């Protein structure tokens, strides 16, 4: 498999790649409001030491960069009810796991201590369903302990490590497709968050953060190579159709902003996908 470039040279009519949300997946946070951030090299090292490298999806922790840049965050506009059921198929399990990690990043960025435990509980259930529960348990306990002491920067590191260890465990099981879906789930949930935040307080500059051509192409490519049986589902068909429409809406010249109505359309499209991930096709 060829390594994907996420922050390299882009076409003249495209912006530099940004994590929209809220990836992901595969998920660098800036500004004094979030405290002193670790160097990107340190974050990369965390993933490298666990065997998660450029052959896998980008780290979901990049959602912090976008959430921080869009502060103050209208938490109630970006939050959602956590899924209460565990999906029976591994594709939805992986997508849901990534989405809940992104929910955790939102909770930590907004410093909502009361929401930490519910996120950890749901994440544990999903990770067990994927067969990687033991890789999440120690981090969940540490996150709860650090939340009680309001050690938000350290909690962020635990969340980064959680995704990296889940990816590494899945790769160890030769489950690369599922590892990519964890990242995709985080990216989709992150995109829903950021479109909600931008729509609540719109400006052309804030809306530019939704333009991420290389990540969009990367995940569309991932969707096109999914298991044939999964591609027959309503979720996969909706994901493919809606992501292509999101790409159309956000493909702009550098001097043309994403309009407010387009931001709302993107939010609606990605929310439809996330609803199917969380609740299935019933």
Question: What does each model-found stretch correspond to?
Answer:
Residues 86-103, 123-130, 134, 183, ...:
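Long, amphipathic, charge-rich alpha-helical segments that form helical bundles/coiled-coils
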Residues 117-121, 141-142, 181-184, 206-213, ...:
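Short, charged, amphipathic alpha-helical segments
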Residues 228-282:
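A cross-kingdom marker for long, charged
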């Amino acid at each position: 498999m060829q390594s994907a470039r996420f922050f390299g040279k882009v076409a003249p009519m495209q912006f530099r790649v940004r994590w929209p949300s809220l990836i992901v997946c595969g998920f660098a946070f800036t500004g004094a409001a979030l405290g002193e951030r670790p160097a990107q090299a340190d974050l990369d090292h965390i993933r490298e030491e666990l065997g998660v490298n450029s052959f896998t999806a980008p780290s979901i922790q990049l959602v912090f960069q976008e959430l921080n840049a869009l502060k103050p965050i209208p938490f109630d506009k970006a939050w959602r009810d956590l899924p209460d059921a565990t999906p029976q198929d591994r594709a939805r399990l992986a997508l849901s796991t990534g989405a809940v990690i992104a929910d955790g990043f939102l909770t930590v960025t907004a410093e909502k201590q009361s929401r930490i435990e519910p996120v950890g509980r749901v994440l544990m259930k999903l990770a067990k369903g994927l067969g990687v529960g033991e890789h999440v348990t120690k981090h969940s306990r540490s996150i709860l302990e650090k939340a009680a002491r309001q050690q938000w920067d350290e909690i962020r590191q635990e969340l980064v490590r959680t995704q990296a260890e889940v990816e590494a465990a899945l790769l160890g099981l030769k489950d690369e497709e599922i590892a990519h879906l964890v990242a995709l789930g985080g990216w989709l949930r992150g995109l829903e968050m950021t479109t909600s935040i931008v729509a609540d307080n719109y400006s052309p500059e804030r809306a530019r953060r939704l333009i991420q051509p290389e990540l969009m192409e990367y995940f569309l490519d991932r969707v096109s190579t999914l298991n044939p049986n999964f591609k027959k589902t309503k979720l996969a068909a909706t994901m493919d159709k809606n992501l292509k429409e999101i790409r159309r809406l956000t493909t702009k010249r550098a001097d043309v902003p994403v309009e407010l109505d387009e931001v709302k359309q993107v939010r609606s499209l990605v929310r439809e996908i996330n609803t199917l991930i969380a609740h299935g096709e019933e």
